[in-house]
Amino acid sequence: MQLKKKPVTGMKDILPQEMEIRDYVIGLIKETYKQFGFTSMEAPCVEHIENLTSKQGGDNEKLIFRILKRGEKLKISEAKEENDLVDSGLRYDLTVPLCRFYSNNANELPQPFKALHIGNVFRADRPQRGRFRQFMQCDIDILGEPTYLAEIELVLATTTLLGKLDFHNFTIRINDRKILKAMAQYSGFPAESFDTVFIILDKMDKIGLEGVSEELEKEGFARESIDTYLGMFREITSDIQGVRYIKEKLKDVLDPKVAEDLETIIASVDAVKSADFKISFDPTLVRGMSYYTGPIFEIAMDEFGGSVGGGGRYDEMIGKFTGQNTSACGFSIGFERIVMLLLERGYEVPGTGEKKAYLIEKNMPADKLLTILKQAEEERRNGTQVTISIMKKNKKFQKEQMMTEGYTEFVEFFRDKL
């Protein structure tokens, strides 16, 4: 039987040209985030199935790659349901593993803990542009910091990185889960229906206010509640004035500190930012994960046509491991989507230095080859990237191929002439 050469559906092979950009971006991520005090950590890509199915991951829990029990623990004939056959799965994000990691190692970590976590995650999703079943995710999280300083630092660190990658005119959309709930409560929606309301609200970009109105009506909600709810969205602006409007409008159902903190985050980021972007209050921003408890944010880029990153505060998640809540806030960038955008725009890694190719005639005597190897080693010590290859018959094609890899200078060595 002939083996299959193509990767499994939803996976991809990464060629050297893309790998060079990926390596550069990862290096820049580490360099930039460490300037903000984040430190690297790692957790296994395999997690307990109980942790992955704890109703914290939203729709991602439907996309888990489950791992069968092994050996004596695997009793297929006695299994009554799927979970009787599995005890672990591949992580679908980095947040659940981070919370388990922190819960297990908190006594050995600084407080607050500023974590940088880069690694592959896995989702049995439908592949599409910029979306794969295995993909790299890059998260920064601040654990143990209850104030809005965490949100400010996360937004500034992430936007500084994007600025270094020559991204401009993007938008950080920001909202707060408490504002979402207060708006729904003020409008008269029953608390048990909030999630349904938010799922419909999340479609605002695609179906508009009228579409949201129609879907809410189809769900059987009162017309008065729908009109009150959507009337606020017509009045709210995307700046600090919009936050102040919400603070006044919802004063009977919303702690004023929620709006005041959000205003401080927006004003602080605007005053300090170094990258070219705007931060915009967006009361329609929902974010799919149920574990968010406070401010939430998302990166919107017109050239991608959607989100390329996001995050928020999740103060109640670590408590599910320890029994005691710990303040936590994180921001994840869409690493694969950002690399895809860089490739599409023909991005070149800066400062790669000179790349030189030594082409050696076939059957070069050992003593002469040694001389060439010493010469190459000397150039490498001086900072030049040197590759050594045997000269092919079609030398022109060989050079053209190497030029696509960035080699700009070629040195030819022959047996009778060095």
What are these regions (language model features)?
Residues 132-138, 174-182:
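Short, conserved phosphate-binding/catalytic loop or strand-edge motifs used
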Residues 1-92, 96, 152-156, 173:
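TRNA-binding/sensing appendages of the translation machinery
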Residues 55-59, 186-188, 295, 402-404:
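Short low-complexity, flexible loop/linker segments enriched in glycine and/or proline
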Residues 60-76, 188-212:
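Acidic, His- and aromatic-enriched active-site or binding-groove loops in soluble protein domains
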Residues 18-36, 47-48, 82-85, 93-107, ...:
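Positively charged, Gly/Ser-enriched RNA/tRNA-binding surfaces
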Residues 169-178, 197, 280-286:
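Short, surface-exposed recognition loops or helix-turn segments adjacent to catalytic cores
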Residues 157-164, 178-186:
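Hydrophobic mid-domain F-helix/FG-region of cytochrome P450s
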Residues 52-53, 181, 203, 398:
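Short Asp/Glu-rich motifs
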